[in-house]
Amino acid sequence: TEIDAFAVHAARANARLNDVPMQVLHADLVGCDDGWDVVLAGDVFYETEAGAAITDWLESLHDRGALVLIGDPGRAYLPKDKLSIMTRFEAPRAGDLEDQDVGAARVWRFSAPSRGLPELED
């Protein structure tokens, strides 16, 4: 799902171009729980209030057993104290929208030592 109509259109176009069957919904699921096993969140910690609500929601999904993965370019409101880094890489930035061509991106997960997933140093 995506809350931005332009991003929904872009995701659908990308799926078509790559012959990937995918359903993209224009909806806000924060606070919902349909029993997902895996939850992916991308670049969602850019505002204080929204970041707090999203953190609470993702943490509740994690606490009931979902694997919660977060892609983040280093936003200020990322709850690093609740997360572990899974991987990091250099990612191209969006030209005129960013002040650098390439930046560090990371994939985080809510900390869960019992799941046996590897830890990386930041």
Language model region names:
Residues 1-122:
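S-adenosylmethionine-dependent methyltransferases
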